[in-house]
A protein has these predicted regions:
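Non-transmembrane, aqueous-exposed alpha-helical and coiled segments at domain scale
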Residues: 1-423
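Positively charged, low-complexity/disordered segments
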Residues: 425-428
Length: 428
């Protein structure tokens, strides 16, 4: 491992935390460069779970520097809740670095997130109402407030006043509500955060660049998934950032050639949270069984995830747009006990066979899965430690997916625990 990016290759919730946790133990630097505290990742240490949203996964390793990069939208309140949770469990937080270029999520972003979703009526996009989208809107509009602004009281006061006035006009003029944002209240709250944040704030682009040039091991930690990418995902049912390998480079402030390997995290089946077309979605007992066996409920929201068979069209697309160099195949054990397992190898839209993932959601909604059926397995695989010890039908399933995607599966997750949960092929 030198520089590795870990990217979700479906709609998120693929089990990235397991692989990131595994790789973070070897990393000198772990970087998060996109999203905010809308996407959760769970780490397990000695049977204890730590649900993190902003802080990188290397935090459990005392010698690892954990970078919250310039591409993050930073929620100070959520950040310090995580700090308190970690420190109360005896975990040091001194090795966290926050980019001075990261944009800040304010209370008005969260309120506007909820108002906008409510106004959509039947056309909701499934926002987590964490203020992520509105914060990125301010960033794109070039009116946002960054961490470096918060570090200067006068600059912060000037910019916050403009924003509070603008947001109150938006609330009254567009949503027909009374003005709800108070400058003094927000200013006083965030000035306290500023002083608490100050020891963590640096130009993180220098930290990441210097680490790579010194041949240190750097892990780019992805959140969410490829199909939630603002440009490349199932728009508009996407997030407001770029959870793809190209987005990681921008969000960390380094050139794309500095990321040598891109590991795609792929669930052995397909899940999705929220709205939008889902070609292989199962509405029967099989879908319920996958959901139950896979414990498919959101880390942050608790929402039940929609479940379906493996969609090779999606993952082949993700492999292409991310430049995947390998795949980590997660939650294979969830499929244990099925007599037959299906793989979606293409879509059918009317009389037409579709092999590439459509841009148009209207087209995607018309697509039906073209399935290939394989024999399942009934052996317990949760204690398997070597790839060759997997049941033959499980190995055939993986081999067929490698063939369809064109990328090697180098890591297979076979259970919930850190020890004995993964079987690595010899080439890893």
């Amino acid at each position: 491992m030198k520089t590795v990016a870990v990217v979700g290759s479906q709609w998120g919730d693929e089990g990235k935390g397991k692989v990131i946790d595994f790789l973070a133990t070897q990393a000198d630097v772990v970087v998060r460069g996109q999203g905010g505290n809308n996407a959760g990742h769970t780490l397990v240490v000695d049977g204890k779970k730590f649900a993190l949203r902003l802080i990188p996964s290397g935090i459990l390793n005392s010698n690892t520097i954990n970078v919250i990069g310039n591409g993050i939208v930073f929620d100070p309140k959520g950040f310090f809740e995580e700090i308190e949770m970690l420190e109360s469990n005896g975990i040091s937080t001194k090795n966290i670095k926050i980019s001075d270029r990261a944009h800040i999520v304010f209370p008005y972003h969260k309120e506007l997130d909820g108002l906008a979703e409510e106004a959509r009526g039947d056309n909701k996009i499934g926002t987590t109402k964490k203020g992520i989208g509105p914060c990125y809107m301010d960033k794109t509009e070039r009116s946002g407030i960054r961490v470096c602004d918060l570090m200067d009281k006068e600059i912060f006061a000037k910019k916050l006043k403009l924003q509070v006035d603008a947001k109150n006009k938006l609330v009254t003029g567009v949503y027909g509500k009374e003005a709800m944002f108070d400058f003094d209240e927000i200013y006083n709250e965030f000035i306290v955060y500023a002083e608490k944040m100050r020891p963590y704030v640096e130009d993180t682009t220098v930290i990441v660049y210097d680490a790579i040039k010194a041949n240190k091991k750097v892990l780019f930690e992805g959140a969410q998934g490829t199909l939630l990418d603002l440009d490349l995902g199932t728009y508009p049912f996407v997030t407001s950032s770029h959870p793809t390998s190209g987005g990681f480079a921008v969000g960390a402030g380094v050139g794309p050639n500095m990321i040598k390997d891109v590991v795609g995290i792929v669930k052995a089946y397909t899940t999705r949270v929220g709205e939008g077309p889902f070609v292989t979605e199962l509405f029967d007992e099989t879908g319920d069984r996958i959901r139950t066996q896979g414990h498919e409920f959101g880390t942050v929201t608790g929402r039940a995830r929609r479940c379906g068979w493996f969609d090779a069209v999606i993952v082949k697309y993700a492999a292409r747009v991310n430049g995947l160099t390998s795949i980590s195949f997660m939650l294979l054990d969830v499929l244990t006990g099925f007599d037959k397992i299906k793989i979606c190898t293409a879509y059918k839209m009317g009389d037409k066979i579709v092999n590439n993932f459509p841009a148009s959601l209207e087209d995607l909604a018309k697509c039906e899965p073209v399935y290939e059926e394989l024999d399942g397995w009934h052996e317990d695989i949760t204690k398997v430690e070597k790839f060759e010890d997997l049941p033959e039908n499980a190995k055939k399933y993986i081999a067929r997916i490698e063939e369809l995607i064109g990328v090697n599966v180098d890591l297979v997750s076979v259970g919930p625990n850190k020890i004995g949960r993964a079987s690595c092929r010899e080439r890893v």
